[in-house]
Amino acid sequence: MALVSLPWMSPTLPSIQLATLASALRQEGIESDVHELYVDYGARIGLNLYNLLGNLLGYLPEWVFSRHYYGPEQGDDLAAMLEQRPFGDDFPWPELADSVLAALEPVTEEYLDDLVRQTDWSRYDVVGFSLTISQLGASMAVARRLKRAFPALRVVFGGSQCAGPMGSTILRICPYVDAVVHIEGELVLADLVRRFRDRRPLRGLAGVSHRTSGGEVVTEPAAELVMGGSRKLDLDYDAYFHRLLRLGLADKMNPWLPFESSRGCWYGQKVQCTFCGLHDIMEFRAWDADAVLAQLERLQERYGVARFYSMDLILPREYLRTLLPRIAERGHDWMFFYEVKANMRRSELETLAAAGIRWVQPGIESLDADLLALMRKGVKPHQNILLLKWCHELGIYCGWNLLYGLPGESQASYTRMAELIPKLAHLQPPSGGGRFQLHRFSPYFEHPEAHGIQWQGAHRMYRYAFPIAKEDLDQLVYLHDFTLDPALGEPVGTAAVEAAVQGWRRANRSGATLALTELSGGQGVILDHRDVEKAPTRHPLNQAETTLYRYLDVGVAEKLLAERFQRDHRACFDALGGESGMAALVARWLADDLVIRIDGKILALAVHANRMAPRRQPPPADAAAASEPVLVDRAAVMT
């Protein structure tokens, strides 16, 4: 069997999807070859341009390849897409956009021809395509070429882009696909291959769509089949590294090794965020910590790479007590990416840092309590700020988004955020964001009326990538158009927040600082250089003032502040002049924006210089399909 992955996966990651399936097939006695052909396309058009295109909304990456399906299949080269100016504001140099898209057409055609010619596909009886990130157009184009060249070949699609009704729709619109797997592929792929080889019908094979002898598309019920947490799979990335060497890319990028330690989301299983459509299977399962550690050690030893990219939707909570301390105890000098929930304690973040987790995506999404409640995030704004502050101290890079345009939001939320953001200039700004999108499987999508959303169908631009009936297009894609119920009122203005975010990014790039340094004798000084266009301001603190400021590090309920500080630090409380003196000091700090009033608490904003970790270079922006923007070299794009 051949296992294939096409653009637009990140070239800096081997395909864990193919490696997982190959391992499962080996355990069933079925041989397979892995073909990570997205790397070839990145090498052909240049990694900078590849990353730029791959991070755009899905309709344009899909169109780059779908025109090579519908052109020869239906005589439609999908040129109408060009009239829509599909790059929008996302292309760095608009004057080059048309030239780049025009140049891609013959290059992509040549890539597809070479792909079929350079591999002996006659060696295989089944080809499986993994579809995850805007890979449908490319997979359809290649499936057509292979099926026409080798009519006896069986073609299977699977992956998250085939979940739910999307999979059966693929069968309806593409006659070159024989079966589509909707569920986790390890559960059924071996049985599916055996049935193909034995010429047995696919009827009753759970979670698989297929055609009857009469051509009708049938989807077998999944029966809640999910992978358990006791599996044992050995990931093999040999094919990827051989490909890098063959293409001359081994010295041009720093790969990350993807791994998986859980599936599902322990928070989403209880309360799914309203906008989140990451997957249709939220049931949470974590793998055995010892098995994960053994796999990481084997991968590092075999490939000499110590950068690990977790594919988990969320870090398993139990790993704070098991996997991460064990990594630290063994002294591994590793670097990790993980997705986490934002309401972590500092001690938990210290555990992450000690294990080498230097890049997190915490799902902050907003800094306003009302907006976070609308999203059902389960966190408060002060917890998001604490995470940013502590990650800054611990040398953990945060990639996070700021979302706008939620149904039911108010202008007051954005007024509050616009006032708050300049006070946070010393912390990590959002790396992405914008108006929320309507994704399949999200609560907003599943129950639009309950949230004041009027569903309009598939995103309008997809019709230029897939010229099919609207009812099929609505079932095929992940991104959808919508309007908001007029009863929700006029759209709120976000210009002030967007301008504040731009200022935040500029200040952060210029080294904005707000830091408390503790001196001998218990005294301290706060250096405030958040406004990088002005000279920094020094705020000397005596011992009692330093103690109070440190006390506010995690935030203290304002109503209980005097009572608790007197209880815990009686001598300092008296030195400050009791409750009235302490209140006057806090008022001065509030006026200077050294502390803020948030969620009913008084929260200190300065990071602690005495506990800052050594600064490390942030992870590369092209490491994976994350929220981080891609830096593009103009000369490389033109070349």
Task: Identify the residue ranges that each predicted region occupies.
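Short amphipathic alpha-helical interface segments
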Residues: 529-569
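Short, amphipathic alpha-helical interaction segments positioned at domain boundaries
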Residues: 600-639
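A short, conserved structural fragment
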Residues: 587-601
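Short amphipathic alpha-helical interaction segments
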Residues: 572-588
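Conserved C-terminal portion of the radical SAM core fold
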Residues: 1-4, 27, 300-301, 306-310, ...
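Glycine-rich beta-alpha loop elements in corrinoid/cobalamin-binding modules
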Residues: 8-41, 93, 100-222
